């Protein structure tokens, strides 16, 4: 069956809008519905999974009502929700808008699956274009921008999607010339065409968002190439891997899969990429991305039932525009087409449930403390098995768009990212050495404010108004799909004009950072003992080169207390590491220490000879940001550094307040 270009474009646009909604909905689970590290992860996981389980009822609704009315209504709800989310309302309004858009998107996928037996071109195009746009937008989606450009582009995308959904005939196309709908081609057999491809929609969405087509992960991977020893720095051309990954994914997805032994390269590449990602090593991220991208595309191509005769059976509507296909929809399992449509609907609903299970299973580990490395490997294994399930491809036919030109066009879009989205701030000590340093320590909660909005502006202003020389950040997220796939560190560094050094804690993309307007040398990271804490912790040490041989050591950390205890063991480890690293030079240790003045963990720093730089302003509560009650964000300094003007800056751009202090350096 000839798959129409309009159907492919509409499917791709719908996928793009659904991913946009997901990037708002997923962070809302841990910032609005609940709070990471305080709300039980089981409760947040149940909330997330419930909507995907509910979507399993959609195929029955489609079979009873008919695909077209269900698809059109769901498309309208998805489009409206996506457009309204551009206002970034925050709070419960944002959460329920995104939830409505998500559920509508799932139902729309089921309805589309009932009428689309060759979804691979549309799915692949949607995933690839979304990744390219995400890269060009520097991982800040239109939803969070709110300016006239965001509204214009969002409105155009929504209008085109609704137009495609409303036009008649935007389905899987007519029967092949010379055949009737439902007729088998010579040498082929009837079956549920497209079901395997639809089953993979959810798993491919998960791995493309986490690994293969993640611009934030690509930039993070590039940042690990400049230092080594598990530390990352501001990279040159951080987005350069994105066009390569997009090209590899889209070209392999749209071209004829190899036969015989060549058909194994896709599953093998995908599995190797997933394993490299699961090893949690920053220096392996680029290889994981490129292998996973090519592997995902090749596996999708293996499920492209372009030669199946059932491609004609399902779309009787195309052969009978008068409307008998609608009757066929309502008769359900009495026809081959009805059974095939139902299989596709249940397949895509089940595949999206796999997406939810994988996402919840992977990210809940950071609250519950179990190993999660197997999750991406298991999802990759599922994709590989489905791709291998039926190796017979008889008379493969090209899709609606030429593979080479299509991949080239989307790659050209992605190539704009290194030009438009890559900024590299430069540090200099030409004006040094200074007499004073202003230090800011801030737990940025992955970039999300108390209302659940991705609030780069608020974070930037809270820091910038202190005119800092060095900024120490905690809870820095650089690519988690759960948080929308942003590289929050690079975004803040660009806006503050300060290069960064990053130390991984929970995994290669979540940890602590130091931003400095002075050159930084000798970065080191120390993994801290977990002692029962579910989330990993580390201490990142750097040396500020202030000019004329003047050096100051800075250590950024985020202590993770064991359940019901204080982070005493970690505090002692950080204090010992910092004192040894400084080796007599002036020293600053700061971050979210999860301990209060007078606690045993707090005493580990003072017992090591460090002074509380915020003493003059005590009590100085910093959490929660809207009603501060706890003093858990601190700055310690070595003797010889004289603190002044300590302050906790009022802001709700995070759930913590930033603390700042000015330090007078020892006389030279």
Residue ranges, per PLM feature:
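Hydrophobic alpha-helical transmembrane segments in multi-pass integral membrane proteins
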Residues: 38-54, 71-74, 92-102
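Structured beta-strand-rich core segments of catalytic domains in phosphoester-bond hydrolases
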Residues: 369-373, 423-426, 431, 451, ...
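N-terminal post-signal-peptidase region of extra-cytosolic proteins
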Residues: 452-457, 485, 618-625
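Start-transfer (signal-anchor) and selected internal transmembrane alpha helices
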Residues: 1-9
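Metal-dependent phosphoester-hydrolase catalytic domains
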Residues: 2, 20-31, 45, 65-69, ...
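Mobile, glycine- and charge-enriched loop segments
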Residues: 408-453, 585-586
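Active-site beta-strand/loop signature of hydrolases that rely on acidic residues for catalysis
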Residues: 14-55, 83, 240-241, 245, ...
């Amino acid at each position: 069956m000839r798959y129409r270009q309009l159907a492919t474009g509409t499917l791709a646009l719908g996928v793009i809008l659904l991913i946009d909604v997901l990037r708002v909905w997923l962070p809302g689970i841990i910032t609005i519905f609940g709070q990471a590290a305080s709300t039980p992860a089981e409760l947040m996981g149940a909330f997330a999974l419930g909507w995907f389980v509910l979507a399993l009822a959609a195929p029955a609704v489609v079979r009873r009502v008919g695909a077209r009315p269900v698809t059109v209504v769901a498309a309208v709800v998805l489009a409206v929700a996506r457009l309204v989310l551009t206002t970034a309302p925050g709070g419960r309004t944002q959460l329920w808008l995104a939830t409505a858009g998500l559920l509508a998107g799932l139902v729309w996928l089921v309805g589309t699956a009932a009428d689309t037996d060759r979804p691979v071109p549309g799915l692949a195009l949607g995933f690839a274009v979304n990744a390219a746009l995400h890269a060009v937008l520097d991982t800040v989606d239109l939803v969070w921008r709110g300016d006239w450009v965001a509204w214009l582009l969002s409105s155009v995308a929504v209008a085109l999607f609704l137009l495609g959904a409303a036009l008649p005939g935007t389905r899987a196309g007519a029967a092949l010339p010379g055949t009737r709908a439902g007729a088998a081609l010579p040498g082929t057999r009837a079956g549920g065409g497209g079901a395997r491809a639809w089953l993979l929609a959810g798993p491919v969405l998960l791995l493309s968002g986490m690994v293969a087509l993640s611009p934030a992960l690509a930039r993070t991977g590039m940042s690990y190439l400049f230092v080594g020893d598990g530390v990352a720095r501001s990279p040159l051309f951080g987005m350069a891997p994105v066009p390569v990954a997009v090209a590899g994914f889209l070209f392999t997805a749209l071209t004829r899969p190899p036969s015989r032994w060549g058909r194994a390269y896709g599953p093998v590449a995908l599995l190797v990429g997933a394993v490299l990602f699961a090893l949690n090593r920053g220096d392996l991220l680029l290889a994981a991305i490129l292998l996973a991208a090519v592997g995902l595309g090749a596996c999708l191509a293996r499920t492209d039932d372009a030669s199946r005769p059932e491609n004609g059976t399902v779309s009787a509507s195309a052969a009978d525009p008068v409307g008998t296909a609608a009757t066929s929809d309502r008769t359900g399992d009495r026809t081959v087409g009805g059974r095939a449509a139902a299989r596709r609907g249940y397949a895509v609903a089940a595949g999206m449930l796999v997406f939810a299970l994988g996402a919840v299973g992977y990210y809940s580990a950071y609250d519950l403390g179990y190993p999660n490395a197997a999750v991406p490997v298991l999802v990759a294994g599922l994709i590989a098995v489905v791709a291998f399930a039926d190796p017979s491809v008889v008379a493969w036919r090209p899709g609606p768009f030429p593979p080479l030109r299509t991949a080239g066009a989307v790659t050209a879009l992605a190539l704009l990212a290194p030009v438009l989205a890559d900024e590299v701030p430069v540090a200099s000590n030409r004006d040094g050495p200074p007499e004073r340093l202003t230090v800011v320590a801030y737990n940025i909660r992955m970039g999300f404010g108390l209302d659940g909005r991705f609030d780069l502006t608020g974070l930037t202003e809270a820091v910038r108004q202190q005119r800092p020389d060095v900024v120490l950040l905690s809870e820095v997220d650089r690519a988690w799909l759960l948080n929308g796939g942003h590289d929050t560190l690079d975004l803040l560094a660009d806006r503050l004009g300060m290069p960064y050094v990053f130390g991984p804690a929970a995994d290669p993309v979540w940890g602590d950072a130091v931003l400095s307007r002075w050159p930084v040398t000798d970065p080191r990271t120390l993994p801290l003992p977990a002692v029962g804490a579910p989330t990993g912790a580390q201490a990142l040490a750097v040396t500020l080169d202030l000019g004329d041989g003047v050096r100051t050591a800075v250590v950024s950390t985020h202590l993770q207390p064991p359940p019901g205890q204080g982070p005493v063991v970690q505090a002692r480890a950080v204090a010992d590491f910092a004192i040894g690293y400084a080796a007599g030079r002036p020293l600053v240790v700061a971050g979210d220490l999860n301990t209060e003045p007078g606690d045993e963990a707090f005493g580990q720093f003072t017992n090591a000879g460090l002074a509380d730089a915020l003493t003059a302003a005590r009590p100085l509560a910093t959490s929660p940001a809207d009603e501060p009650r706890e003093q858990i964000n601190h700055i310690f300094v070595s003797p010889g550094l004289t603190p002044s003007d300590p302050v906790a800056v009022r802001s709700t751009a995070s759930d913590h307040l930033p603390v700042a202090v000015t330090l007078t350096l020892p006389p030279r």
